[in-house]
């Protein structure tokens, strides 16, 4: 890959989440890997879920509640008594009553290492960083604990895109 392409990829990679950057090839897991992760998972904790309807995390949580079989746990220490479609919030991953299969992160990249440590302590299987979010330290922490790591991908987009494959894998 020439320097111009590398620079272009880095520029796109560093763009804010709202611009929906495409993941770099090195961090984009194959569709069969994503399919297996999503088909085998039963519970998802969303760290940084927002009770505010104008936030992306709120829209993603609402979609997951209405279009997937996942048991959803919303994590936000500042949400108080708020809810999303009847789902209340937990102050931390440690407060979630069961080990989540997937921990989805809607936090700034620099805050993800602490979330990774919490995800390991919660015995999660997957650390999933949403669009525009990646962190090498967090990824290394999760991988060292045997977790799968997904960076810079939207769980809603991937689930919708792979819906048929997920359904087939769940039956198999």
Where is each model-derived feature located?
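Short N-terminal or domain-adjacent regulatory/targeting segments
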Residues: 11-41
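Mid-chain, well-packed structural core segment of small domains
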Residues: 93-133
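A charged, well-structured terminal subsegment
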Residues: 158-172
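Active-site regions of enzymes building and remodeling cell-envelope glycoconjugates
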Residues: 85-93
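A short helix->loop->beta-strand "cap" motif at the edges of active sites that frequently abuts
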Residues: 67-71, 122-127, 145-147
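Conserved beta-strand elements of the Class I
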Residues: 45-47
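Rossmann-fold NAD(P)-binding glycine/threonine-rich loop
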Residues: 131-159
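NAD(P)-binding Rossmann-fold cofactor-contacting core
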Residues: 51-55, 62-84
């Amino acid at each position: 890959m020439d320097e111009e392409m590398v620079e272009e990829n880095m520029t796109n990679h560093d763009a804010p989440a709202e611009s929906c950057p495409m993941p770099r090839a090195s961090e984009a897991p194959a569709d069969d890997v994503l399919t297996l992760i999503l088909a085998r998972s039963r519970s998802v904790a969303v760290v940084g879920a927002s009770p505010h309807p104008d936030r992306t995390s709120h829209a993603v949580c609402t979609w997951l509640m209405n279009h997937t079989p996942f048991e959803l746990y919303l994590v936000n220490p500042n949400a108080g008594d708020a809810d999303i479609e009847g789902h209340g919030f937990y102050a931390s991953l440690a407060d979630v009553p069961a080990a989540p299969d997937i921990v989805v992160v809607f936090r700034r990249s620099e805050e993800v290492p602490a979330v990774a440590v919490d995800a390991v302590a919660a015995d999660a299987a997957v650390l999933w960083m949403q669009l525009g979010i990646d962190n090498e330290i967090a990824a290394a922490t999760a991988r060292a604990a045997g977790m799968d790591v997904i960076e810079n991908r939207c769980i809603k987009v991937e689930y919708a895109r792979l819906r048929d494959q997920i359904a087939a894998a769940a039956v198999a």
